[in-house]
Design a protein with these regions (language model features):
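A short SAM/SAH-binding and catalytic strip from SAM-dependent methyltransferases
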Residues: 101-115
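Class I (Rossmann-like) S-adenosyl-L-methionine-dependent methyltransferase catalytic domain
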Residues: 1-35, 39, 44-91, 115, ...
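A short glycine-rich, Lys/Arg-flanked "PGG" loop and its adjoining helix->strand segment in the class I
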Residues: 118-130
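A short acidic, Gly/Pro-enriched loop at the edge of an enzyme's catalytic core
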Residues: 90-102
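Short, amphipathic alpha-helix enriched in basic
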Residues: 73-76, 100, 104
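Conserved strand-to-helix beginnings and helix N-cap segments that scaffold or border functional pockets
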Residues: 96, 114-118
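Active-site phosphate/pyrophosphate-handling residues
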Residues: 4, 106, 119
């Protein structure tokens, strides 16, 4: 995924996304986890921090400097503190066993390359404390709008009168679960987003996984 693309869309992203994309899921996690040091991987403009702004020490990483500028703007507006670091998910600049918890909402599907995605998840596991949990979401290949697409997709975003394209690797449930197990996570749950009501999970927009480091 091109850093330049996210730098280009950061301002418009901030304007249209003022609330967490999976708000009910994150609010439940804030109740489950209560307090601790939390890492947001691919934090973008920081909306997914909101449910955790009380009781948690917040850290966010993103490889887009412009997104981090919007995160600073967002946290100042909503009056919470987040420690923001420009870094790539495949090489997190933290020591082993630094964080109690982590979230990564719609982040890992932007990483191009099978080995790179595995490396990024290994990095996440490395910086989590033993017993620490992480909530990860990726886009599902089975959602209807992608039925005629390859698993490597370019999804448009309009900014400044032009179209730019974001890279996505579209996961199946089986592929994502297999990858998480390979990295060494214990899967606590894997399911669609809570707003999804269809009885067959395979068509959901998101795959949501709660995992634990042994």
């Amino acid at each position: 995924m091109s850093r330049e693309v996210f730098d280009q869309i950061a301002e418009s992203w901030y304007r249209v996304r003022h609330w967490p994309r999976l708000r009910s899921e994150l609010e439940e996690l804030a109740q489950r986890w209560r307090s601790g040091r939390l890492l947001n991987v691919g934090c973008a403009h920081g909306a997914d921090f909101l449910p955790f702004k009380g009781g948690f020490e917040l850290w966010g990483v993103d490889f887009s400097g412009e997104m981090l500028k919007q995160a600073q703007r967002f946290s100042a507006k909503l009056q919470f503190k987040a420690n923001l670091v420009m870094a790539d998910a495949v090489s997190l600049p933290f020591g082993n066993e630094t964080f109690d918890y982590a979230v990564a909402v719609a982040s890992y599907h932007h990483i191009k390359g099978k080995q790179e995605r595995e490396t990024a998840l290994q990095e996440l596991k490395r910086v989590l404390k033993p017993g620490g949990e992480a909530f990860l979401t990726v886009w599902n290949w089975g959602q209807p709008r992608f039925w005629l697409r390859y698993k490597e997709a370019r999804v448009p975003w309009r900014v400044g009168g032009k179209i730019v394209y974001r890279y996505y690797h579209l996961f199946s449930y089986g592929e994502f679960e297999k990858l998480l197990v390979k990295v060494g996570f214990e899967i606590v749950s894997i399911s669609p987003e809570k707003s999804y009501r269809f009885p067959v999970k395979n068509f959901s927009r998101n795959i949501c996984a709660l995992v634990k480091k042994q």
